[in-house]
Amino acid sequence: MSENRIRIATRKSPLAMWQAEFVKAELERIHPGIVVELLPMSTKGDVILDTPLAKVGGKGLFVKELEVAILEDQADIAVHSMKDVPVDFPEGLGLEVICEREDPRDAFVSNIYKTISELPLGATVGTSSLRRQCQLRASRPDLIIKDLRGNVGTRLAKLDNGEYDAIILAAAGLIRLKLSGRIASFISAEQSLPANGQGAVGIECRTNDERVKALLAPLEHLETRYRVIAERAMNTRLEGGCQVPIGAFAEINGDEMTLRGLVGNPDGSEIIEGIITGPKTEATQLGVALAEELLSKGAKSILDAVYAKA
């Protein structure tokens, strides 16, 4: 492999391509003369579009094929949305870089209504996320929530075609695709706790590839890493996959981190919440401690029931 070349495995969706192009541009800016190639490919999560994600099952629906490409030396790195990245990595691969986070909030998108509270009784809302569903149903049990799959453009088209009164999407994806004008309102973390890692981009590579690791190092954003590590540690202790009714959101003020977490029944009948504060350098311990608190309040029975239905 040329010392001045790097190959990026990426999903083919517009948002995934944006993330890969972002990393490509950053590498070219930091390392003038470097040759960066994009290798777009489809993953299981991209191909199975007629089934709710929670029923597709398994972890790593959007990353496995990319990891195989790195392990087989067809690619040097893979660029991921952190909320899609499983907790465990194949032997020989690791999460080398977490880039600076975009807005982690959920976005309320509607052509008619400005906020969730404006939705009329019995309105139809589209989201495939069990996390969003449980929080939405808890606050508005009258709403009809329907599954929503596909890339951002497909989801917006379904809204525009009148299939839904509103849809909920990650704000970061809309902002990155220059579609922030479609956002009717941002949903506060207090109203809809984000998914762990939401809004952050991670870069995976071979753990023994010192050449690539050195090229990637300047893209690391330490504060984002602390936040995402805490959120993922909580999810790991709860044994959560990609599609679970779990929310986690860390914020940093100086050297202190505050981590909020929740586990909810997808029907909105029960939501277990917790909050913890401590040194940001103890991100993993904070995440595990908060998970233990949620488990002590009964989170395991909710998650067991969700997995039994999947």
Swiss-Prot record:
Pfam families: Porphobil_deam, Porphobil_deamC. Its EC number is 2.5.1.61. GO terms for cellular component: cytoplasm. Keywords: Porphyrin biosynthesis, Transferase. SUPFAM superfamilies: Periplasmic binding protein-like II (SSF53850), Porphobilinogen deaminase (hydroxymethylbilane synthase), C-terminal domain (SSF54782). It comes from the Bacteria. Pathway: Porphyrin-containing compound metabolism; protoporphyrin-IX biosynthesis; coproporphyrinogen-III from 5-aminolevulinate: step 2/4. GO terms for biological process: protoporphyrinogen IX biosynthetic process. GO terms for molecular function: hydroxymethylbilane synthase activity. It catalyses: 4 porphobilinogen + H2O = hydroxymethylbilane + 4 NH4(+). The keyword Transferase applies. InterPro entries: HemC, Porphobilin_deaminase_cofac_BS, Porphobilin_deaminase_N, Porphobilinogen_deaminase_C, Porphobilinogen_deaminase_C_sf. Binds 1 dipyrromethane group covalently. It is an enzyme of class 2 (transferase). The keyword Transferase applies. Its cofactor is dipyrromethane. The porphobilinogen subunits are added to the dipyrromethane group. Tetrapolymerization of the monopyrrole PBG into the hydroxymethylbilane pre-uroporphyrinogen in several discrete steps. Belongs to the HMBS family. Monomer. This is Porphobilinogen deaminase.
